[in-house]
């Protein structure tokens, strides 16, 4: 880097690690806090699909891989099946993924006319709020309007033991978007976009700065993914 401020660096007391990995599938992601980064956003789109196929909960572009509404609906229905009460908001989330006529009587979907702080159980919903089904149906049968892709993903999460309504342990972000954040474990893709590669070839220091930010996000372990094209990547 041509123009930089001198800095003094001090090591931490504990050991860390830096590993070069062929593919993200080769990393054990089922425990701990993770930050997965790349220089360009499009590089991360296949990563999100891989995490879904592995049954892992994550945040990407500031959004959970399972929306709060879907989490509320699935969790709400299972709470009702256990004989517990849920909030009006959760009940509305449940109803929003049920078909009119087979799951909920017509005219009851919005659950109008109830106090906002009311707690509702299965019996009340059946007797007073048009619910046509009961605890004989598990969530993926009761919530018949849930998109199939989400149904498969939630099933994969549950099989892996992930708590789909918890705060995600894994964040997927561009390096720029992760500035200021950090994690015990960082996974870094070194591929460059065409624009970044061109800037790098003419001696632009910005690419150095970007990857300096990336590697310094790791608190314990840094995993460097081998690039698809060595001629268009940042070597670490």
Regions found by a protein language model. Name each.
Residues 1-236:
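The feature marks helicase ATPase cores and/or their adjacent C-terminal helical subdomains
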């Amino acid at each position: 880097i041509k123009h930089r401020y001198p800095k003094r660096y001090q090591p931490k007391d504990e050991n860390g690690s830096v590993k070069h990995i062929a593919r993200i599938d080769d990393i054990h992601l089922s425990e701990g806090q993770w930050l997965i980064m790349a220089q360009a956003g499009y590089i991360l789109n296949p990563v999100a699909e891989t995490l879904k196929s592995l049954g892992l909960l994550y945040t990407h572009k500031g959004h959970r891989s399972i929306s709060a509404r879907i989490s509320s609906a699935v969790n709400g229905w299972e709470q009702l099946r256990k004989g517990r009460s849920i909030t009006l908001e959760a009940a509305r989330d449940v109803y929003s993924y049920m078909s009119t006529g087979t799951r909920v009587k017509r005219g009851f979907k919005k659950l109008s006319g109830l106090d906002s702080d009311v707690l509702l159980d299965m019996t009340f919903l059946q007797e007073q709020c048009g619910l046509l089904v009961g605890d004989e149906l598990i969530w993926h049968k009761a919530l018949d309007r849930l998109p199939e892709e989400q149904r498969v993903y939630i099933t994969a999460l549950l099989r892996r033991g992930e708590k789909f309504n918890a705060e995600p342990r894994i964040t997927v972000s561009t390096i720029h978007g992760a500035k200021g954040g950090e994690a015990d474990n960082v996974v870094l893709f070194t591929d460059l976009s065409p624009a970044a590669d061109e800037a790098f070839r003419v001696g632009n220091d910005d690419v150095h700065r970007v990857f300096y930010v990336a590697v310094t996000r790791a608190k314990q372990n840094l995993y460097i993914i081998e690039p698809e094209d060595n001629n268009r990547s940042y070597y670490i």
